[in-house]
Amino acid sequence: MIGNDRWVTEIETGPVTEARPDTNAREPGDRTPAAPPAATPAATTDQLPEDRYLNRELSWLEFNARVLALAADDSMPLLERAKFLAVFASNLDEFYMVRVAGLKRRDQMGLSALSADGLTPREQLGRIGEQTQHIASRHARVFRDSVLPALGEEGIYVVTWADLDQAEREQLSTYFHEQVFPVLTPLAVDPAHPFPFVSGLSLNLAVTVRQPEDGGQHFARVKVPDNVDRFVELGGTDTDGAEGAAVHRFLPLEELIAAFLPVLFPGMEIVEHHAFRITRNADFEVEEDRDEDLLQALERELARRRFGSPVRLEVADDMTEGMLELLLRELDVHPGDVIEVPGLLDLSSLWQIYGLDRPALKDRTFVPATHPAFAERETPKSIFATLREGDVLVHHPYYSFSTSVQRFIEQAAADPNVLAIKQTLYRTSGDSPIVRALIDAAEAGKQVVALVEVKARFDEQANIRWARALEQAGVHVAYGIVGLKTHCKTALVVRREGPVIRRYCHIGTGNYNSKTARLYEDVGLLTAAPDIGADLTDLFNSLTGYSRKLSYRNLLVAPHGIRAGIIERVEREVAAHLEHGPQAGKGHIRLKMNALVDEQVTDALYRASQVGVRIEVVVRGICALRPGAEGFSENITARSILGRFLEHSRILHFRAIDEFWIGSADMMHRNLDRRVEVMAQVKDPRLTAQLDDLFESALDPATRCWELGPDGQWTASPQEGRTVRDHQVSLMERHRSP
């Protein structure tokens, strides 16, 4: 399954300076031409059109619409469709908490800086509101009209109070009085009771009650508790479901509470009740002061997060006008921030339904294979001995994280010849074996350094806990460089081998998280190459001390080196292409990433396209680049692959200059300017062949994907009736454990 903590994307914060408005027309994306057009004179940025960027906010909404398309796809296993409905909802929550909140702050402050496509914050907010209302309504309809009936056919029902018979109502009455009623707190609003604070993302009932004596009406709010299952399962299930499976009947918790409102308001007449949900601004910045403890500053800001200003109000579409006006007034919400939903609010709760033990309704179980280089034979093989023989590239989740990267750290912790372990930690699992190994290593007397990024959004509290646990065990914990997030995925092991000190390294695209490593697609390089070991030594010295090294032997490091390094390689690719003659078609750039937004990198790609370099982009989420546009991007194609696993790796290939790079950085402002990121060159021909195979599979014309047109619209590909292959399924079959 896909974890419900952070599935599909990370939301960028900071300057909102990218974009181009969306349009209504949808046209199929063009295929990569067999032969590029003839070369045209090289262009400067001034010669590129002003409308060359797509709007990054609307592009993100298009991405979430692709997630919704998976939920609407009846060829998907049914509970996987329910999962994608939950993913869509969680994604949209975070988008409003961060991106929309940032735009609202800029609008309220009167900041008039335009996005890259020339829109003001207010104009972007207007377009976001329109597009969100459309896709949120479609989201609700997919659940109500497609997934919900299909669940019923499989013996899984989400019912209303009106659907229940008397015996079921009596059963739920007992449950309500014993399990729910004690945790409810009805809050009245009158001169003695001000309007209550409504916490972000909480589900609530807005209730109007009438006094029988004088007919006076009053408002009250009832919070639906979030520590009780959202879907209350009725007991007494049988096995009349599909193929003898158990029947499950669920009642939404808010329906149960609504049925017993007279118990909460005895002696009052219930006039009306409606569900609503508010989203609050969670886009805060920690003011880092060299004289203040970062953890204390962060904890102070986390306490403020729950009190952020409202950025969205979700209501059932049957809410009365009077009730809506009251909520708008009391919650201080702009009418343009209201999303009317035709059905249940907060479908992120569908993770509960996904958790049912119905394997026939889910993806087939996949067990990652152990990489052949690390496969145990008669005796367990030392990872250090393996790396002395040559570099290893691991592709997760197809190759196991636990028997490669995790084992690398665990063996280092247990090896008496290991002198030091240094590692960056951005997001890790709650019961992290990586953190446990670091603690064991420190307790065994090794020098252990952990660079813990406590500012990883929405994981701050967990990272603070781990940082303190590591410190208590004797680990040297550092928090990086003031003003920068440390996002790179690097580990360095220093080992004594006779008279020699040897360094072993891991550089990856994904977090050191054994749980998400089963769900996220990532690549990692394990190596004993001396130049990379020397580079990582310099990098950790920079992160933990006062070193400010800007250049490295075999790495590109942000915020100073990645953008310039990539643009330099694009320009070298152009030079090699022109040297061999444009008709030879030698220039060819392939990029795989989560997001492509940065204007300088995008312009470099446009200029390469104009001289005939072929450029293929595989981007999971946001893409501000306009492919296939006449005059500047005819030789660029862009596609997006979504599926069972979250495509998370960042891989760059420059064919004419024969360079492959992997790393943690997407082409976004936050990654290139406000984070410590690392990209490493992969040189071993055995490993570059593996990366080449990955690109060939992702870019196969028959691969199931969406293709981006110059108008900013994504079109499903291949077209109906053509042969279709699934990139991820193909890789699973290739790597499936026996």
From Swiss-Prot:
Keyword Ligase: no
Reactions listed under catalytic activity: [phosphate](n) + ATP = [phosphate](n+1) + ADP
Listed cofactors: Mg(2+)
Any GO BP: polyphosphate biosynthetic process
Active site per the UniProt annotation: H487 (phosphohistidine intermediate)
Entry keyword Chaperone: no
Chain residues that bind Mg(2+): R427, R457
A molecular-function term among this protein's GO annotations: polyphosphate kinase activity
Gene Ontology cellular component list: polyphosphate kinase complex
E.C. no: 2.7.4.1
Residues bound to ATP: N91, Y520, R620, H648
Record region (Disordered): 1-48
PTM text: An intermediate of this reaction is the autophosphorylated ppk in which a phosphate is covalently linked to a histidine residue through a N-P bond.
Record-stated family: Belongs to the polyphosphate kinase 1 (PPK1) family.
Functional summary from the UniProt entry: Catalyzes the reversible transfer of the terminal phosphate of ATP to form a long-chain polyphosphate (polyP).
Name the UniProt record assigns to this protein: Polyphosphate kinase
Organism encoding this protein: Mycobacterium ulcerans (strain Agy99)
Native organism taxonomy: Bacteria, Bacillati, Actinomycetota, Actinomycetes, Mycobacteriales
Gene field: ppk
